[in-house]
Amino acid sequence: MNIGRKPKTITTISVVFIFLLCFILGIIRWINIFNENVFAITKEINSHITNFNISLMLCTLIGYLLLYYRKKYWIIVIVGLVLISINLIYETIFPFINTVDLIDAVYGVVGVIISLIYLLFINKKGFDN
């Protein structure tokens, strides 16, 4: 018995593409540690790409699995809001664990927002009914 929704081929390809893109951006970020001339788009983006990647991948993975198992989109929005809250708290309130960095928090929020928009689209068009 299959309880999950059947994703369209393009949906599966797009999810893999998102994770591949995040992986490539992460690799570029870590190469930059050894060679400052290697960066993704700009040096500013390069220094915050890790938070963007983590937020985008985590929200996309959790959201995709929830959609696959027929959960409502509003549950994914709650997950996104929780991720944004955790990100903002971690980047502003816990300076003893992490350097306070509001720009890093903004990149994390942008990652979640992009993921939520993508998940809204695949919720409407990305699965066979």
Predicted regions mapped to residue ranges:
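Bulky hydrophobic segments
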Residues: 1-129
